[in-house]
Amino acid sequence: MIRTPRSNSYEDYWKEFKDIASSTDGENEEEEITKTPDEGEEEISWLKEAGYDFVVNYITGGRELTDEEIQGFTATLTTSQAAVVRRRVNTLSATIRSKQKHKVDVRDIFPQPPDNQSPRSPVPQTTSDGIDDINLSAVPRRHTDKRLPSLYRGRGEYSMSGRGNEVFKDPEESGIETLSVQQTGTFNKHMVPDPPDDMRRSVMTAMPSISDEDIELCIEETAPKNSMQNAGLEKEDNLPNFNIVPDRLGVTMVTDLSLEDMKQIKSLALIELTALFERHHIIYHRRKGKKKGRDHGIFGVPLHTLIEQDQKIRPNQTVPMVFEDMAKFMEHHCLEQEGILRIPGSASRIKQLRKDLEDKFYSGTFSWVNVLPHDAAALLKQFLRELPHPLLTHEYIEAFAQVENIQDKKQQLLVLNLLILLLPPVNRNTLKMLLELLLKITQKRRTNLMGLSNVSMIMAPNLFLSPSSRSKTKGVREMEISMAAGTSNIVMMLIKYQDILWTVPSVLIQQMRHQNELEMQKKNREKSIMKFLRKDKADVYKKPAVINEGDFEEGVIRVLAPSLTKSCAAVKLTDNTTAGDVVDKFRNTNFTNGRNKKKDNNVQGVANFAEKDARLYEVGGNIGERRLDPATNMLALYQLNPNAEWVIRSESMD
């Protein structure tokens, strides 16, 4: 007779919660006090995380941004994304003005609607008949009137990355055209004024425009299949099945992009997440934890502290070593244990194991040989819930919980995807390792009686109940218990859809490319900024030239493989050439193993060919670095990024 997992009820959740409460000794519990943010503090924090440090510096310095300037640095955003940025800029500007009590502004007496208005000059301008000047916000975004005056005053530092400064002087001299500021990207060094409207339209056409409707995950719902059981998931979860839709430009995973590119993607993800929540009328609070945690040891130590000390031992470590050891032990010895995660281990043994880990782990003398499965599971859960800063972070743990309030399943997945992108790398990597372990546990459900629902309900309180919920503050405890009670579905989605959630939406990559192209154009204009005074400025605004124009016209790419015998080759692309096809040209078709001792007629010694794990990388041009999906259509990508370099690398040789 086939045994099945326990019924889908909240019994497992409440039992786990009681076990958590009873296992907390309270001796070292530190009360977390939620401080009400100072006026304007939330807007400053949000704008900085969204990449607009220069805007914060400009406004807090007592200056004003015109509508044209705001439209300039939000030009690469969708309408809803730009509106989100504008509202926060307007709110911060109004807050700063209100703090300057010695100076009363008419806008503080007659405030403008926040959704479609923006700050103007400190002194309201009127025409001779007393009628207010034209409302700048009525000018369509990306198509501002070049005749409108700019209101730069004094000095302003403009750099999206914060690495460059440019002084803008007041354009008082007659005949000098006033220009706006565009948002910068990762490659920005300096900011320079923008071209006039007609020129701006020409450079904007380098990439297709992006609408609000384009921001979505490329997934499609599929009918239930018997293969679901092979994935470890049954229809008991009541969740639809989704597949990733192939993309001509390749599906991009989080780990495929460089760290610099991910910083840019993170800024875009925050803006889009905020726009989505506002569209669904959902409010969440970005908390800041006050609990510092220990600066050494295992339990109660922040993840960033653990990974910093671990990388001194293993430079390429991406998750805390102790958590990796726990997960690997459970994967090898605990998956088939009945009631794993649900049945508690021995309190006395767990206490001793904790002490042994603290004392022996980093000296290399701790042994997992005699550790029992349920004790190991208890250690892993204790490690997670005792983190002084939650795995899902103080800033976004409430946002994760709020996903349940969105009705559309695809929209839920998009929000979860954006939240994953917003996590710090160590949190995101640790969460992925945890979810992979939990999925493997559900794949053995007929043996361990732990289906997806059971695992999710048990893990929800360990992920969503912060240490403050176990403090003496009853109000805080009841609030977080209420919040966590509805989070088992969120954990279920994280487990089931993890492959989808760790992709980077193609539209965000498109926006990043767009920003970087504008930055390259600004760099070119920087070298000849005095040409702005000439009557004919067409040469200043022309698009960056294709470096190898002959190759581009013929559809030929130059592929570099510095670690292989054939270190460089020209590859002619066809409509069907994929990134995998390009790598195959560097493999030895006579051998299954990439590295072999076959003598080459042209090269003396050992011939190195591409290994099985070799991948093609897109480097430079309008992106930092991206590891390509083998199914990427190379001709389509080449046309999008003609100035990129193409490099083959093997993970085993890095």
Regions found by a protein language model. Give the residues of each.
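Short amphipathic alpha-helical segments embedded in low-complexity Lys/Glu-rich regions
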Residues: 340-347, 370, 393-403, 438, ...
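Eukaryotic mixed-charge, acidic/polar low-complexity intrinsically disordered regions
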Residues: 605-608, 612-654
